[in-house]
């Protein structure tokens, strides 16, 4: 069984003007697809063939880990975004954010700051720790909370390929627009899991 590029949960132009169709074409259609292709080539004929993406991530290293984690991270990221989304969360997500960060405004400021300061290529995550509290975690390169006991709730991709076409080297501008796309329904499902 080989892995396939999962379908986007929206049209390629649906996130405009915040993320352009051109960015989606390169980021999803080229970068994400390349991770899928590389992973399939790397696991062919190995003990990883036939395992789930999560099993591979938790038990691999090097190129297999990097490509498997990037496939998973990107799929998760696309689901963290939605057209006509953003705003503030409600319900249990809003309550959990307030309990852990004081307010949504404080959380948003801390998450944005962590993502801006995430040096080089990587991901910034909102996770639920094993004690139930929420935390902001930044990972480098293909790092993912799947290798910890934390549950990922939300992520932003801060590799330059995520924003360079639309925002050049202005990561803060990309993050400002990210908040207009956050799919709080997806975050709520992750929190409830």
Can you say where each PLM-predicted feature lies in the sequence?
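Feature for soluble, non-membrane regions of globular proteins
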Residues: 1-193
